[in-house]
Regions:
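Short, structured motif recognition centered on aromatic/hydrophobic residues
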Residues: 62-72, 81, 98-102
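A cross-kingdom feature marking solvent-exposed beta-strand/loop segments within repeated
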Residues: 79-103
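Acidic, glycine/proline-rich low-complexity segments that act as flexible tails and inter-domain linkers
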Residues: 20-62, 82, 90, 114-144
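Short loop/beta submotifs within extracellular cysteine-rich repeat domains
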Residues: 77-80, 111
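Substrate/cofactor-recognition hotspot
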Residues: 64, 104-115
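Bacterial Sec-dependent N-terminal signal peptides
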Residues: 1-21
Length: 144
């Protein structure tokens, strides 16, 4: 009986550890490593390595949505919001969805904060439009 319990516990631990792939982040160490090494460690290993890696509890897409909402609500419109907007895009949030998300946030967090966030979101999601236009222009030139 004890062997069965131990085997069951081992298989649960193995399955859990295999299912949760840790996110590898080096931004903290790259940008603050020698200036603030402990902060860099907490950023890379705990925030991203542990918290963001808990995808069974909350998907990366949903974590992006929560993070963006939090940053915009605080009025943070610096490179950290740009980074998280790009992450949200990479995690599956569409241009239509981000427009609706920021519009909704505007009613609760403030209209000026939404305006500022839209400026950054437009840059992140318009990369696709610019790329499409460049490809279309190239194709049109080739047809002439």
């Amino acid at each position: 009986m004890n062997k069965v319990i131990l085997l069951l516990i081992f298989s649960i631990l193995t399955t859990t550890s295999m299912a949760q792939k840790k996110i590898k982040q080096t931004a903290g160490r790259d940008q603050l490593g020698t200036f603030a090494p402990k902060f860099a460690e907490l950023n890379d290993d705990i925030l991203f390595g542990e918290v963001w890696s808990r995808t069974e509890q909350l998907s990366l897409r949903d974590r992006s949505l929560v993070t963006i909402t939090s940053l915009i609500s605080q009025g943070i419109t610096d490179s950290s919001l740009t980074f998280h907007l790009q992450s949200a895009k990479n995690n599956g949030i569409t241009r239509t969805e981000i427009a609706e998300i920021i519009t909704h946030i505007g009613f609760y967090a403030g209209w000026p904060k939404a305006w500022a966030a839209f400026r950054l979101a437009k840059e992140v999601w318009n990369e696709d439009i610019s790329k499409d236009k460049d490809e279309k222009t190239t194709f049109q030139r080739e047809m002439i």
